[in-house]
């Protein structure tokens, strides 16, 4: 009888002792020895950022044609560098990626994923192009499949300097509507062409650990105010036209 009472007392003591900690197996600080949740659980939230080149609500692919201001443009190549990608709220900034290359011809570059520790943010920030440190490197400094590697064919060796092509747009243009297309190429490469973009978007993960945001690039807006019929050389220097196009790209983003 005494043994039974002793066993009962031990059981009561054991069950009355609460080991507080994180009891959620989904948390990164889950403690399987805890039997009472103390609200200390910490999580990694999965963010999927998807990019698309658009004509209004239509996502474009290679050889699609857009029409605007009596012009028709067939898009054949579109590459755009993003740098220092981050998300932020009023108190914290969290880095996503140092460099990312969107390539219309490669579906594997249509999105970037990241795990972040904050469960809400209000801004999505990035540079269009590369910072001076990144732009001073060469493909030989990277693995071949790195965004800055040789496989992506975005490095330009010029007579006076070397540079990555921040924005590459190639296609065919019809300015008179008779179906006769001629080549139109923009290769924008210069340190001064870097633009910083901040998109406002309230994202709250709530109880879910996964969230997706869509960032669109409106192709028509890139050509806003540009004389497409003019003869335009490769933009290997700091030209007014190059700045105008980069400014237009800066204004062509929308986050959904």
Residue ranges and their predicted role:
Residues 9-12, 208:
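Low-complexity, intrinsically disordered/propeptide-like segments
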Residues 4-6, 13-43:
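Primarily marks secretory-pathway-exposed extracellular/lumenal segments that are disulfide-
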Residues 7-10, 25, 75, 218:
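N-terminal functional modules and adjacent low-complexity/disordered segments of proteins
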Residues 44-256:
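A short, solvent-exposed, low-complexity linear motif enriched for acidic/polar residues
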């Amino acid at each position: 009888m005494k043994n039974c009472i002793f066993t009962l007392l031990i059981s009561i003591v054991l069950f009355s002792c609460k080991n507080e900690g994180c009891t959620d197996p989904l948390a990164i600080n889950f403690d399987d020895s805890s039997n009472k949740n103390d609200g200390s659980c910490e999580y990694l939230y999965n963010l999927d950022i998807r990019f698309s080149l658009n004509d209004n609500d239509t996502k474009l692919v290679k050889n699609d044609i857009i029409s605007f201001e009596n012009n028709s443009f067939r898009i054949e190549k579109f590459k755009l560098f993003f740098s220092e990608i981050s998300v932020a709220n009023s108190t914290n900034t969290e880095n996503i990626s140092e460099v990312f290359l969107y390539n219309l011809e490669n579906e594997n570059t249509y999105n970037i994923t990241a795990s972040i520790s904050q469960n809400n943010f209000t801004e999505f920030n990035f540079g269009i192009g590369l910072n001076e440190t990144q732009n001073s490197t060469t493909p030989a400094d990277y693995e071949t499949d790195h965004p800055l590697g040789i496989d992506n064919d975005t490095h330009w060796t010029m007579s006076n300097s070397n540079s990555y092509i921040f924005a590459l747009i190639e296609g065919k243009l019809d300015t008179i509507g008779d179906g006769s297309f001629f080549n139109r190429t923009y290769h924008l490469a210069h340190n001064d062409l870097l633009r910083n973009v901040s998109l406002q978007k309230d994202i709250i993960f709530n109880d879910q650990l996964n969230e997706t945001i869509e960032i669109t690039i409106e192709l028509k807006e890139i050509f806003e105010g540009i004389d497409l019929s003019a003869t335009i050389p490769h933009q290997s220097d700091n030209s007014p036209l190059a700045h105008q196009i980069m400014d237009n790209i800066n204004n062509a983003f929308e986050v959904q």
